[in-house]
Curated annotation (Swiss-Prot):
Catalyzes the condensation of carbamoyl phosphate and aspartate to form carbamoyl aspartate and inorganic phosphate, the committed step in the de novo pyrimidine nucleotide biosynthesis pathway. This is Aspartate carbamoyltransferase catalytic subunit. It catalyses: carbamoyl phosphate + L-aspartate = N-carbamoyl-L-aspartate + phosphate + H(+). GO terms for molecular function: amino acid binding; aspartate carbamoyltransferase activity. It comes from Paracidovorax citrulli (strain AAC00-1) (Acidovorax citrulli).
Length: 320
């Protein structure tokens, strides 16, 4: 049965769905990161497979487009030896008016064991988790503006890999925070793991007004936001989610909030620069930073496979 306190956990407090980092105990987040560390080396093997999900069926249901996230989930599932189905939503019954729950019911009848769901509506993975059979697991691959927990977890893994400990870090999250589910997941991950200073940096039109309860410091200039930071996480402008004139122009945005090598010098000399992708060079970040020695953007992608392997193996190993 699902826990009344947290629908992601069973009555024993074990992870059966990953819907959000918010509300997860630190012990579970740490367990995911520790498990991911054991999977990183699979990348370097001649045969990049482990048999943990052999015989299991993983259905990737991406109601929103995403090449990077869908691909890494597919690779992660296959490296766990699962059978993987990528549903073509544009040609599925969902595009013909079938309800979300009817789609899930029909796919469940095909003996699905795990659904990876990306949806434009916040809360869609929660709804699915409430209606699947006890042996079926749900992983949120991004829902509306709400959450992107595996991206948040891979960001936490990347920070831990390079900085070892969260207890003395200053982390700046820069850009379109208003529309960013990644920012919310990163904030929850950082506060859960004990990061003492999390800064949210952006123009007033792109920073939500309700962040104070999340324990972050809001900065409206890039210079203030990244000064002496250990980690700088850059976010793209999500123009597809914007309505109205939230920004004067991409050029004006880059002038004020684009990360250049000169501005990066305000951060600590050993600061790392992260980005969840896709990157818009010359809008939120200069190419010289993307390709520079402080960027760890490609390692994020590599670590993302291991983190998603960890999440799938953990939830699939627990019963509702």
């Amino acid at each position: 049965m699902l826990s009344k306190r947290n629908p992601q956990l069973n009555r024993n407090g074990e992870l059966i769905h990953l819907l959000s980092i918010e509300g997860l105990p630190r012990s579970i987040v740490t367990h995911i990161l520790d498990t991911a560390a054991n999977f990183v080396s699979v990348n370097d093997r001649e045969v990049k497979k482990v048999p943990l999900l052999r015989g299991k069926s993983v259905f990737n249901l991406f109601f929103e487009n995403s090449t990077r996230t869908r691909t890494t989930f597919e690779i992660a599932a296959k490296r766990l030896s699962a059978d993987v189905l990528n549903l073509d939503i544009a040609r599925s019954s969902a595009s013909k008016g079938e309800s979300l729950l009817d789609t899930i019911a029909n796919l469940s009848a095909m003996a699905a064991d795990l659904f990876v769901v990306r949806h434009s509506e916040s809360g869609a993975p929660y709804l699915i988790a409430q209606h699947v059979a006890p042996h079926v697991h749900v992983i949120n691959a991004g829902d509306g503006r709400h959450a992107h927990p595996t991206q948040g977890l891979l960001d936490m893994y990347t920070i831990r890999h390079y900085k070892k400990d969260f207890s003395n870090l200053t982390v700046a999250i820069v850009g379109d925070v208003l529309h960013s589910r990644v920012a919310r997941s990163d904030i929850h991950g950082l506060t859960t793991l004990g990061c003492p200073e999390v800064r949210v940096v952006g123009p007033r039109t792109l920073v939500p007004g309700d962040l104070s309860h999340m324990g972050v410091r809001v900065c409206h200039t890039l210079e203030e936001g990244i000064r002496d930071a250990d980690v700088v996480i850059m976010l793209r402008l999500q123009n597809e989610r914007m309505s109205g004139a939230l920004l004067p122009s991409s050029q004006e945005y880059f002038k004020s909030f684009g990360l250049t090598p000169e501005k990066l010098r305000l951060a600590k000399p050993d600061a790392i620069v992260m980005h969840p992708g896709p990157i818009n060079r010359g809008v939120e970040i200069d190419s010289a930073v993307v390709d520079g020695p402080q960027a760890v953007i490609l390692p994020q992608v590599t670590f993302g496979i291991a983190v998603r392997m960890a999440v799938m193996s953990i939830v699939a190993g627990n019963e509702a």
